[in-house]
Amino acid sequence: MKALVKAKREEGIWMQHDVPVPEVGVHDVMIKVTKSAICGTDVHIYNWDEWSQKTVPVPMVVGHEYVGRVEKVGAEVEAFRPGERVSGEGHVTCGFCRNCRAGRRHLCRHTVGVGVNRPGSFAEYVVIPADNVYRIPDDIPDDIAAIFDPFGNATHTALSFDLVGEDVLVTGAGPIGVMAAAIARHVGARHVVVTDVNDYRLDLARRMGASRAVNVAKEDLRAVMSELGMREGFDVGLEMSGNGRAFRQLLEVMNHGGKVALLGIMAGPEPVDWSQVVFKGLQLKGVYGREMYETWYKMVAMLQSGLDLSAVVTHRFSIDDFQQGFDVMRSGRSGKVVLDWGAAR
């Protein structure tokens, strides 16, 4: 089959046409991929950064954001039938650790990542356990279904705390950050402020519904807070940037008793003024992936109740033009990039 493969321990990803079709175990489902999306993780793997070198075995079929149709099911699978439109949870969990057995699979100690530690979805076919397959309702378009993985990250992070009537700060205007901003507005936050230094992505945040999108290299965040009538600080902070300076500023402008969810990963150790956390009585929560499968149910419910994410998909290419997709992702001048397998030449 055709697939995008991390074939060498160097910068790049390569199209190969002779990749073996994955085998289907008795509890597995084979999905014929129709559309894929490029994740920031895929860009890290493309760049072959320090994390990728330590994490990804080579060769590896990459990718974990997709939508497709069931092609084949294993002998013991009863919940799915060929032809059904589906996506899949990208974290394969063990099922036996304490957290898995308690229903907290997103906290599994032995998580294996699709397209990172096991063959992924930048391929004509991907095989995952039936437990990881999620059926997509007919009223959700393919382009949105293909980004359920990062949409799930945004949902898990944003809905970590009650947002109704709250003032929310989102640090980082990448695709997940701007989707989190849209979610916060959808569920009833008062002011949603997004910070970044990338004007393209700040404009995207505005189109996704942010009250204010602030370039902190040019504007004073506290002045913006005053303009909005905020007197005591933000009630909820969502750290999506992985930038130490952004996190430190977030802590400075949080209200006493505020709540902070962190999805962004810092590149290395960062100095933090922990007195901000202690004396303000802040709550911090780390977020990894999606709650299985409460996050998925909430994603569908929000889309079916009017949440509009269409603006976050900014570029579309045929899978044969994947290099253009990676180039625009690496430029920082994009939202989500979707690759169409049906448009292959």
UniProtKB/Swiss-Prot annotation:
Site (Important for catalytic activity for the proton relay mechanism but does not participate directly in the coordination of zinc atom): D149
Keyword Nucleotide-binding part of the UniProt annotation: no
Gene: tdh
GO cellular component: cytoplasm
Pathway it works in: Amino-acid degradation; L-threonine degradation via oxydo-reductase pathway; glycine from L-threonine: step 1/2
Amino acids binding Zn(2+) 1: C39, H64, E65
Principal location class: cytoplasm
Cross-referenced InterPro entries: ADH-like_C, ADH-like_N, ADH_Zn_CS, GroES-like_sf, L-Threonine_3-DHase, NAD(P)-bd_dom_sf, PKS_ER, Zn_alcohol_dh
PANTHER family noted in UniProt: L-THREONINE 3-DEHYDROGENASE
Subunit structure: Homotetramer.
Protein name from the UniProt record: L-threonine 3-dehydrogenase
